[in-house]
From Swiss-Prot:
The keyword NADP does not apply. It comes from Ruminiclostridium cellulolyticum (strain ATCC 35319 / DSM 5812 / JCM 6584 / H10) (Clostridium cellulolyticum). HAMAP family: Ribosomal_uL6_B (MF_01365_B). NCBIfam families: L6_bact (TIGR03654). Disulfide bonds: none annotated. GO terms for molecular function: rRNA binding; structural constituent of ribosome. Coiled coil: none annotated. InterPro entries: Ribosomal_uL6-like (IPR000702), Ribosomal_uL6-like_a/b-dom_sf (IPR036789), Ribosomal_uL6_a/b-dom (IPR020040), Ribosomal_uL6_bac-type (IPR019906), Ribosomal_uL6_CS (IPR002358). This protein binds to the 23S rRNA, and is important in its secondary structure. It is located near the subunit interface in the base of the L7/L12 stalk, and near the tRNA binding site of the peptidyltransferase center. SUPFAM superfamilies: Ribosomal protein L6. This is Large ribosomal subunit protein uL6. Keywords: Ribonucleoprotein, Ribosomal protein, RNA-binding, rRNA-binding. Part of the 50S ribosomal subunit.
């Protein structure tokens, strides 16, 4: 039995869960609505205040889908109640971010500012010029948007300049030491 998959998911008050044919699960909460279609073989049971995921047999594919399905449903419930957020930090001289309407404008040492439009269901905030907060109800989309922002200027190992996640630790490298004094 999957250790994660066998745990029931508690549904908080104010959240409605609806299971339709072909394992289409719709979770509605205070922050919004999420729908996702799961593998038709997985058995999803929606009870009064909890959701239980079971697998049809002990085949390897079902064992791997068991924990995955349970975690995805849990992330949907968590997203519509609390939402998800990722914080990014910008390090570097002259590197900064600012918000213009629904656009995020990044000045990252290129010859032009990098503009990024907020996708549907995602909000970006800039509380300080060197900090970006990405918020949303879908954990996967929040992570993708944060990764796309980070991709615009990856952190480099010598000076640590670039965009990094708040919790990320950049392994620093030593600069070149040889060559001084040679002619």
């Amino acid at each position: 039995m999957s250790r994660i998959g066998k745990l029931p998911i508690t549904v908080p008050k104010g959240v409605t869960v609806k299971l339709e044919g072909d394992n289409l699960l719709t979770v509605k909460g205070t922050k919004g609505t999420l729908s996702k279609k799961f593998n038709k073989d997985m058995i999803i049971k929606v009870e009064a205040d909890q959701i239980v995921v079971q697998r049809p047999s002990d085949l390897k594919i079902y064992k791997s889908l068991h924990g995955l399905t349970r975690t995805l449903i849990n992330n949907m419930v968590e997203g519509v109640t609390n939402g998800f957020q990722k914080t990014l930090e910008i390090n570097g001289v002259g590197y900064r971010a600012q918000k213009q309407g629904k656009k995020l404008v990044l000045t990252l040492g290129y010859s032009h500012p990098v503009e990024m439009e907020d996708p549907e269901g995602i909000a970006t905030e800039v509380p300080a010029p060197n900090k970006i907060i990405v918020k949303g109800i879908d954990k996967q989309v929040v992570g993708e948007v944060a990764a796309k922002i980070r991709e615009k200027r990856l952190p480099e190992p010598y000076k640590g300049k670039g965009i990094k996640y708040e919790t990320e630790v950049i392994r620093r490298k030593e600069g070149k030491t040889g060559g001084k004094g040679k002619k």
